[in-house]
Amino acid sequence: MANVYDWFEERLEIQAIAEDVTSKYVPPHVNIFYCLGGITLTCFLIQFATGFAMTFYYKPTVAEAFSSVEYIMNEVNFGWLIRSIHRWSASMMVLMMILHVFRVYLTGGFKKPRELTWVSGVILAVITVSFGVTGYSLPWDQVGYWAVKIVSGVPEAIPVVGVLISDLLRGGSSVGQATLTRYYSAHTFVLPWLIAVFMLFHFLMIRKQGISGPL
């Protein structure tokens, strides 16, 4: 095993990377409230794992979406637990994100030179809410259907481009299969890639600039 480790160490400098990660200075004023961002990340990782597991059984069609969710809940081994954890973790992720935003704002963590970290965090918040909106519709039950109906109809109030935006969200002039397909694609592909990119940027900025000082 030592020879294997030495082989990788020679090429990747694992020890230097580990020392850099573990030796980062943590200011003395940091308390449990500074962990809210990390808890939000943990919730996202749980979301990713449980969501990925459900993609093996979920069917994104208006005819089979609801029955496939019922199948996950009633027939798949531990399916009820996986979906329940997905729902609970989604609520926890939003709650932790809100508390994290409040903590950063109240402690002045958005001030110079951390403006870009704040902006990327706001974008991450928007993406998180978008996850909630798109995921809410996927069971395609009465609640999900009418939620999509309302959400996709809101932009119609915007002058000139409102109808175009609504049609883009729905995939047509009315809510149907195209709408479910778009929401499913956004929830399982587009938004995960977006949040991964902005999370990476967010963490690199924090790593570079460190934790903000006390007020």
Curated annotation (Swiss-Prot):
It is a multi-pass membrane protein. Its cofactor is heme b; heme c. GO terms for cellular component: plasma membrane-derived thylakoid membrane. Heme c binds at residue 35. GO terms for molecular function: electron transporter, transferring electrons within cytochrome b6/f complex of photosystem II activity; metal ion binding; oxidoreductase activity. Binds 2 heme b groups non-covalently with two histidine residues as axial ligands. It is found in: Cellular thylakoid membrane. Heme b 1 binds at residues 100, 202. The keyword Nucleus does not apply. InterPro entries: Cyt_b/b6_N, Cyt_B6_PetB, Cytb/b6-like_sf, Cytochrome_b_N_euk/bac, Di-haem_cyt_TM. The keyword Transmembrane helix applies. The chain crosses the membrane at residues 32-52, 90-110, 116-136, 186-206. It holds the Pfam family Cytochrome_B. Heme b 2 binds at residues 86, 187. One of its GO terms (biological process) is photosynthesis. Keywords: Electron transport, Heme, Iron, Membrane, Metal-binding, Photosynthesis, Thylakoid, Transmembrane, Transmembrane helix, Transport. PANTHER family: CYTOCHROME B (PTHR19271:SF16). The 4 large subunits of the cytochrome b6-f complex are cytochrome b6, subunit IV (17 kDa polypeptide, PetD), cytochrome f and the Rieske protein, while the 4 small subunits are PetG, PetL, PetM and PetN. The complex functions as a dimer. Component of the cytochrome b6-f complex, which mediates electron transfer between photosystem II (PSII) and photosystem I (PSI), cyclic electron flow around PSI, and state transitions. Heme 1 (or BH or b566) is high-potential and absorbs at about 566 nm, and heme 2 (or BL or b562) is low-potential and absorbs at about 562 nm. Belongs to the cytochrome b family. PetB subfamily. This is Cytochrome b6. The gene is petB.
